[in-house]
């Protein structure tokens, strides 16, 4: 199972948009996909409930309480043969709260919004992330996503300058568009929209999808696989 964690301690960074977009992509690709919504607000679950029966199927689970529990009775039962697990996390996570999430994942995607206040909060979160043993030892690979970006804007230039100092680059730069809101209201993702108008938006995600495909093909040791299994198992 390939586990993708979407996290940022800053609220409003677009975690749910990233989660549902990727869920739509993997489901459309025929992968057995499960969405684990660990945010008490339940936005990803709401999106899933709105999804029309005729769309590519995917499974969704409310996981806020169980993922933080350590008892065997709290094991989350994922659908059998789940191939891709997407974990949507709540805002405001502190170090001791985020660590259990990091142990569940193969990759971490950090969405960010290019505004001074949002960037400041995200930098604090990245500092937390880069201190994790999973990241330092290469067990958890990290990439960034610039959300609601308007190219050639002052905010975009400030984002690039900040990332250059961090020696980090964004896997993708998602343009600012109302299309995501309109699709979400119908339980759809960008990859459910075959219109010509949506093609440039889908192209925004190509670099990230290629990066994820490479990460999924990377070999994982038995020890790493055991750590990642954590309180998640297949029913």
Can you annotate each of these PLM segments?
Residues 148-151, 160-191:
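Beta-strand-loop-alpha "switch" segments that mediate conformational coupling across diverse proteins
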Residues 96-116:
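Inter-motif core of Ras-like GTPase G domains
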Residues 120-139, 147:
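Conserved C-terminal guanine-recognition region of P-loop GTPase G domains, centered on the G4
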Residues 3-13, 24-99, 103, 184-188:
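P-loop/Walker-type NTP enzyme "switch/lid" segment
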Residues 17-18:
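Hydrophobic positions on the alpha1 helix immediately C-terminal to the Walker A/P-loop
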Residues 182-201, 206:
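Inter-lobe coupling/hinge region of RecA-like P-loop helicase motors
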Residues 216-235:
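P-loop NTP-binding site
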């Amino acid at each position: 199972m390939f586990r993708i964690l979407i996290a940022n301690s800053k609220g409003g960074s677009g975690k749910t948009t990233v989660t549902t977009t990727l869920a739509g992509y993997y489901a459309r690709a025929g992968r057995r996909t499960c969405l684990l919504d660990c945010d008490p607000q339940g936005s990803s679950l709401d999106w899933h409930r709105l999804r029309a029966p005729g769309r590519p199927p995917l499974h969704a689970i409310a996981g806020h309480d169980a993922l933080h529990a350590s008892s065997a009775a709290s094991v989350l039962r994922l659908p059998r043969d789940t191939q891709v697990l997407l974990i949507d996390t709540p805002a405001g996570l502190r170090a001791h709260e985020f660590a259990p999430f990091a142990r569940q994942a193969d990759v971490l995607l950090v969405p960010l919004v290019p505004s001074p206040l949002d960037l400041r909060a995200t930098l604090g979160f990245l500092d937390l992330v880069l201190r994790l043993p999973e990241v330092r030892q290469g067990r958890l690979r990290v990439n960034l996503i610039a959300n609601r970006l308007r190219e050639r804007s002052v905010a975009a230039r400030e984002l690039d300058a900040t990332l250059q100092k961090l020696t980090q680059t964004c896997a993708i730069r998602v343009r600012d568009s109302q299309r995501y809101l309109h699709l979400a209201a119908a339980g759809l993702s960008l990859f459910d929209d075959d219109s010509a108008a949506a093609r440039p938006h889908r192209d925004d995600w190509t670099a990230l999808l290629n990066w994820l495909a490479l990460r999924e093909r990377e070999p994982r040791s038995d020890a790493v696989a055991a750590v990642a299994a954590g309180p998640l198992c297949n029913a």
